[in-house]
Amino acid sequence: MTDVLDTRGVAHSRTLVDAGRLRIVLTECPELIDAVQRLRYDVFAAEPGFSDQIGDPTTRRDADHVDDFAEHLVAIDDVYGVLGCARLLAPPRAIAAGGWYSATEFDLTEINEIGGSVVEMGRACVAPGHRHGAITALLWAA
């Protein structure tokens, strides 16, 4: 869990879902992206099944160049802070980033023709102890 950040009225953030004390925001806010990168590191580096090379143990961040081009869906609880996230990369942003992140992991040749009409969603995670489905459902609803 991260420090609670009040995103109401924060530049570069837009609330998409307001569910009481839990909000889903779409953001490019550096402070929120930093909190997202810390959550991703905590989830991806600490849990079994992920690569040992995910994130930077020195900074305790899971970050790459795509973060600078993407928009980020962030689940923020008024009490617990950032509890979930997903990274969104629309076609113009993918072009600016040098391509889809997925293309570094998979051969996307077969779906190249639809690339201009899709948004890549990746780096999605929810904090341990909060994986009861509500946060994931709200991220998808946004």
Question: What residue spans do the PLM features occupy?
Answer:
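Active-site ExK catalytic segment of metal-dependent nucleases
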Residues: 85-91
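A broad, low-specificity signal marking well-ordered, structured residues that form hydrophobic/aromatic
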Residues: 22, 86, 119
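Generic preference for flexible, low-structure residues
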Residues: 38-43, 49-52, 60, 89, ...
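Conserved GNAT-family N-acetyltransferase fold
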Residues: 73, 86, 124
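Acyl-donor binding region in acyl/amide transferases
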Residues: 91-142
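Short amphipathic alpha-helix that is part of the acyltransferase structural core
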Residues: 12-83
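Eukaryotic low-complexity, non-globular regulatory regions
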Residues: 1-6
